[in-house]
Amino acid sequence: MAVKLRLTRLGSKRNPFYRIVAADARAPRDGRNIEQIGTYNPNNVNAAEVKIDEELALKWLKNGAKPTDTVHNILSREGILKKFDDQK
């Protein structure tokens, strides 16, 4: 089973809110996920609000989960990918 770290959209029209989840690559965007890793709120006034459980993200990366481009950018901004590369 190929696992991806990706965003699941929540919120109302023109007011998105996302969960960062580990999901089967074949599942639909807002479909079944395996585990929630964090949240991403791009609508915050000053800057996008990101909350990530670092241990869960590192666990999934170690197990071979591939992040999507957007999640890759979020993880690198938070410094999680640097920690993952240092552990290799």
Swiss-Prot record:
This is Small ribosomal subunit protein bS16. The keyword Ribosomal protein applies. One of its GO terms (cellular component) is cytoplasm. It holds the Pfam family Ribosomal_S16. It comes from Staphylococcus saprophyticus subsp. saprophyticus (strain ATCC 15305 / DSM 20229 / NCIMB 8711 / NCTC 7292 / S-41). One of its GO terms (molecular function) is structural constituent of ribosome. One of its GO terms (biological process) is translation. Belongs to the bacterial ribosomal protein bS16 family. PANTHER family: 30S RIBOSOMAL PROTEIN S16, SMALL RIBOSOMAL SUBUNIT PROTEIN BS16M. Keywords: Ribonucleoprotein, Ribosomal protein.
